[in-house]
Amino acid sequence: QTRANKFMWLGTAQLFDAFAFIFEKTEAGWIWAHAYRFDETRSTFIVECSEETWRGIGFDHMSQDDAIATCERIFARHLGGNPLLTNAGHLRGSAAWINFRRVLCERWSFDNVVLLGDAARTAHFSIGSGTKLALEDAIKLAEVMDRPHIAQDRASMAEALEEYRTERHTEVLKIQNSARNSTEWFETLDRYIDFAPKQFAYSLLTRSQRVSHENLRLRDPVWLGE
């Protein structure tokens, strides 16, 4: 399933203390970034917008360098003078912009090939669970493959791989449902963007339905009490 919004995966030397959502209004419409620090010197900076805004800004006919420079201007006050970085410099024109693809495979193994992570299923980047899910897949796969004599017994191998798929598939469905809710929230941003700031923040925080009103009360009772 291919989703509606366009996004470009970038990086920056600007460091963010926590996962940040940054919204900027342009003449063509709203554009936003999902930003988070991933090591001591770099942050991920994913730029996303509707296709209408994407075309309105002119990204559809810009070179990648021009598109990055445009994003640097749009988000300048959040970048502290740092440039935006790409590891996809080989892509021409608008090819660096992607529509997210939701993937869910029914079968996770065939013969001696086993899928994990995004190869088996995807979860939208707005909930930040892709790496976590892949590592949990690897842990479960290692667990079932480490059983005695499994390599010499094809029936036991098949049972182990089905246990891996069944257990991880159930967990993945929960995450994908939350990811779908989050994806759709960003795809329909116009419904929420004119809310009062606190109402907008509440909607943003609860968009996936993984975080409920009571979850927020536990995390920040003072803010919620306001």
Predicted regions and their residues:
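Glycine-rich phosphate/pyrophosphate-binding beta-alpha loops
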Residues: 98-105, 120-132, 183
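Hydrophobic/aromatic residues within well-ordered alpha-helical segments
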Residues: 39, 71, 137, 168-171
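Active-site flanking residues adjacent to catalytic metal/cofactor-binding acidic residues
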Residues: 116-118, 136
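Central beta-strand plus flanking loop segment that forms part of the substrate or channel wall
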Residues: 1-27
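FAD-binding beta-loop-beta segment adjacent to the flavin cofactor pocket
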Residues: 98-116, 173
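C-terminal helical "tail/cap" subdomain of flavin- and related membrane-associated enzymes
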Residues: 143-226
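Active-site Asp-x-Gly
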Residues: 124-146
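Conserved FAD/dinucleotide-binding core of flavoprotein oxidoreductases
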Residues: 17-102
